Amino acid sequence: MVLSNYKVGAGFAVSDMARAREFYEGKLGLRVSIDSPNNVQYLCAEDSVLHIYLSPEHVGKTTETLASWGVDDIEWVVDELTKRGVTFEHYDEAGLKTDKRGIATFEGDAKVAYFKDPDGHTLSIAQAPRY
């Protein structure tokens, strides 16, 4: 299977970053690996990650990205999954624009492609220096 050889991480929206950080860092004891005002990534066992991002309008809705697989060649994985019938999402909005394959490029050369499962949950594959 294409994705079975890659690590998976989870990411989801929070409505209040300070409150979320107090819980994840203070109560759960998670270690910060990437820190910015609206995005925090925690490094867990065996390099697995939990990513939270500030997006109050998406909290509790299926538009959240629920899991993300870290890959080292996103173009190849997008092509392989497309061949298997996966349809990638396309976005053209402030802060999130995808190319014709459905790949968005972010600061630091991070690349992400989003797709949905049969229930409409948003999942992604990501290529970034930390994956």
Predicted feature descriptions by range:
Residues 31-72, 89-90, 108, 122-127:
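Conserved short beta-strand elements that form part of the metal-binding/catalytic scaffold
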Residues 1-3, 78-131:
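Vicinal oxygen chelate
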Residues 16-17, 71-75:
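Helix N-cap motif at beta-to-alpha junctions
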Residues 23, 75-80:
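Short amphipathic alpha-helices within nucleic acid-binding modules
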Residues 19-20, 37, 76:
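Short Gly/charged-rich anion-binding patches and loops
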Residues 11, 38-39, 112:
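A short, glycine- and basic residue-enriched loop/turn
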Residues 1-19, 49, 65-67, 126-131:
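N-terminal beta-strand motif that seeds the catalytic metal site of vicinal oxygen chelate
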Residues 18-31:
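Amphipathic alpha-helical segments
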